[in-house]
Amino acid sequence: MSSSDLLKGEFDGLNSEHFNMMQYLTQDTDEDDGSMVSPTSSADSMHQNLGVQQQQQQMLQAQQRQNQNGIFQPRRFPESPAMTDPCGNVSSSSSSSHHSDPMFSPNEFNGYAGANDNGNQTMNNIQSQQLSQQQHQQTRGGNLMMPQQSSIHAQMQNMNAPQFWSQPGTAAVNQPTNTLAQLNLFNIIRGGADSGMPSPVLEMPRKRSRLDTPCETPRIAPSFAGIDGFPDENYSQQQAIRFSKFQEEQWSPLYDINAQPLQQLQVHVVADKGFNYNSNDNCFVNQKKNHFQISVNVEASDTMPPKYVNFNNRLVPIRDFKLSFCGVKAEMPSSEITIRQSRADRKPHTHTPVLFEIQERRMTKVCVPRLHFSETTLNNQRKQKNRPNPEQKFFLLVVRLFASIDESEHGVLIQSYASEKVIVRATNPGSFEPQDTDIGWQRNGGALYTQGAVSVGTEHQVESAKLTVAGDIYMSGRIINPSDIRLKEAITERETAEAIENLLKLRVVDYRYKPEVADIWGLDEQQRHRTGLIAQELQAVLPDAVRDIGDYLTIDEGRVFYETVMATQQLCRMTGDLDSKIDEKVAEISRRLNEYAVRKKLASSMASNLNGDNKSLSYSRCSLTSTATNATSQPKRSRKHRAIKQAQSCGSRLSQGTVVTLVSIMAACLLAMSALYVLDWHNRNYGYHQHFETNTPSTKGELANLVISPANFMPSFQPDAPILLEKCFNPSCKTYCCTDTPPVVEDSRAIATHGLDNGDEVYPESPSNRTNGIARAPNLEHMAFETGVEIRIPALNVTLDQRYCVERSCNKRKGIFNVFVPVSRYMPDVALEIEIKAPISKVVSNCGAFPSTEFNHKVCPLSRTQQSESPVPTSTRLFDNIFELSMGSFIQSAYRFRVGYSTETCFSEDSNGSYEEYNLIFYRMCTLSSS
């Protein structure tokens, strides 16, 4: 008789109620003979406390129904740890015998407190632990303390809120955790006896006593937990294998005792251990020598238990339910792989289906340990470079629920579930592990990540770059960069004026990579041809757009892109300015055309009125003549016939002459208006050229520039332009560059030129204007050029603006400003400093004095610096915007300055609106008196 039969005979229906579970679990095997302790050996000692235990169970069950909501409890110790045999025999992966100490003891696992939501089963476990502690105390002491009972009862009633992350005591961990499992122990042993699973027989004494749990027998425990409250011991540590429905078309429905169809069973399969996910193979791996353990949770949600099953289109009574396991090939599900189960002697046997019961509105948990695949998958060996074999084969672990009937030996399939793809290997798992360099790669769901940098197609890593790719990148999406203002600081707007100049300096070229570079980078002939920029040239224009990564220079194309954006913005502003100017000109032309149309209409109406008066006059004459002839006699009509014809012909000639005269006058007026319009247009576009005569023929590029002969023209009078050093308040003031005799000074206080005749006041002497007796010009209200450019003479406190323009010599539309600066005879023959202020985005270029072909420079005849200086005027840059002009040594001299976005504007022939030209012409007033 087997050990299971002995246990079944001992635990009959009469003795099941006297079963002492705590004594059976805590008492060790006899060290001398190795015999098994009977679970009912001390059943008599339990009779005295049975009434108290039943009362406690009723109280706890009542509290269970009140606390049906899910409560978090500290994660319990795993039922079967990875390296410890929970059955008290041997380790699952160690070669030591069953006498060896465990890898780690439950007594040393007190700090384990991971959160796990077990649904309503949590309250059952807490209550079961407390009840088991009381029973253990009764067994050892023989009585139960009533104050402790009342204290526990009060604690259970006051438990209204969930408790999170509470630390369990050592006694609570070491005690059994399921009271309902104790109450159904007889069904467990009977199911184990039917399945042929013998109880363990301890052949040798142990080194020390430890907890005995008969795990070789499938554990069946009904639970009140819902379908979503299944505990997964490996959930927080590693990825768990999943099971899905399998061969659903072969399932058979269940019926109750009234032949009413029942709802489908809620089945949840959990692999407690034995399957590890391998990121390199992208699937789960099982070692053939290591067993795996499966827990199946079956819940029936109907009020009636299943009694019949549909078999061959008729209802057949169900004898019992079985749970079986098998493996199938992933590529051919019809090919089954046998599943074996190891027993206490570590010898594998063919797995026998496990019997279990299905109760109404209850959940049944079946735990089947020590399962093995009888075969390994094919093509497990690596091909090259430790990469997975492309011809790798896989298994599927199938869990089947059968209903045993009398008409079929194999039973009827109720439900079946298959796992994900599994690789079963028999060799050392370390041979399939990646190299040390690949340890940093991890998989989180469907994402593969690493903490370090990644290089694709190259062994070199660019400094501070997380990803380095040697080759092309194909992307169907977008590159998204975080640009939230909450992430940024020190935000400043860049000037867009220089962007156009920067883009004009860039050179876009077509090029090919060198053959040796193409060989290293793996580029074909088509990929060698590129269009882009040269890093060295870009570095000279935009230094922040080029980075040095060590061997070569790289270009930040994003920086170049934003430079083009700024240039586009500047072009839009310039286009807007041009549009506004064009609109102004169009409006002016429209106004003139309207005036011309009104004048033409007025002239036409006048001509039509004149023609109408002549016709009415002739008509009236004719009518009077006809009336007179009718009133006279017939003889007088023949006499006056000739006179009437002469009068009619005379009136017709008069009207024709009048019309011709008026038409001629209108034509002359039109010609005159056209000539005036053309002259006005010419005057507006070409300024003051009608006043000047050039010594040399002007070219196309010099049409609007100053090309004059001072001998033939000088401004006769500039009433709005202050003369430099116009007044002198010292009778002994010396004159320069003027050969004529100084005028006689009657008033000893002042010597003034023609400016005093216009009502200019003579300013009194002050410490600020008595330097050498020469007064500085007052700072009158000036008229700016409206371009942002300001020209000043700091030593004289004079600003050169539009007051110094002659007629239309300053043309803002063409960007040319010819400024005539009169200088008095009291100005010394020394150099003069001027200051030109331009906007931040523009640069002032010193183009020097006018060449002799464009301007006739006249040197002072009595200049003290004539022998040492050149007869050609000079313009020297002293500081950024301060220049020194040698105008004091000349009677007349001209200098050119250009303000633009580039420093090369002096070499440009045509401005095209890219710069503004300022021509400063200095002339002494003594030339007027001498001429």
From Swiss-Prot:
Widely expressed in many tissues, including neuronal, muscle and epidermal stem cells. In neurons, expressed in dorsal D (DD) GABAergic motor neurons. One of its GO terms (biological process) is regulation of neuron remodeling. It is an enzyme of class 3 (hydrolase). Residues 53-68, 127-138 have a biased composition (Low complexity). InterPro entries: MRF-like (IPR051577), MYRF_C2 (IPR025719), MYRF_ICA (IPR026932), NDT80_DNA-bd_dom (IPR024061), p53-like_TF_DNA-bd_sf (IPR008967), S74_ICA (IPR030392), WH-like_DNA-bd_sf (IPR036388). Keywords: Activator, Autocatalytic cleavage, Cell membrane, Cytoplasm, Differentiation, DNA-binding, Endoplasmic reticulum, Glycoprotein, Hydrolase, Membrane, Nucleus, Protease, Transcription, Transcription regulation, Transmembrane, Transmembrane helix. Its EC number is 3.4.-.-. Residues 1-658 are cytoplasmic. The record marks 482-483 as: Cleavage. CDD domains: Peptidase_S74_CIMCD. Disruption phenotype: Worms show normal dorsal D (DD) GABAergic motor neurons rewiring but show larval lethality. Worms lacking both myrf-1 and myrf-2 display defective DD neurons rewiring. Pfam families: MRF_C2, MYRF_ICA, NDT80_PhoG, Peptidase_S74. Residues 37-52, 117-126 have a biased composition (Polar residues). GO terms for molecular function: DNA-binding transcription factor activity; peptidase activity; sequence-specific DNA binding. Residues 483-582 form the Peptidase S74 domain. Changing residue 274 to R: In ju1121; defective dorsal D (DD) GABAergic motor neurons rewiring. Impairs the function of myrf-2 by obstructing its function in the complex formed between myrf-1 and myrf-2. Residues 169-436 bind DNA. The keyword DNA-binding applies. Glycans are attached at residues 797, 912. This is Myelin regulatory factor homolog 1.
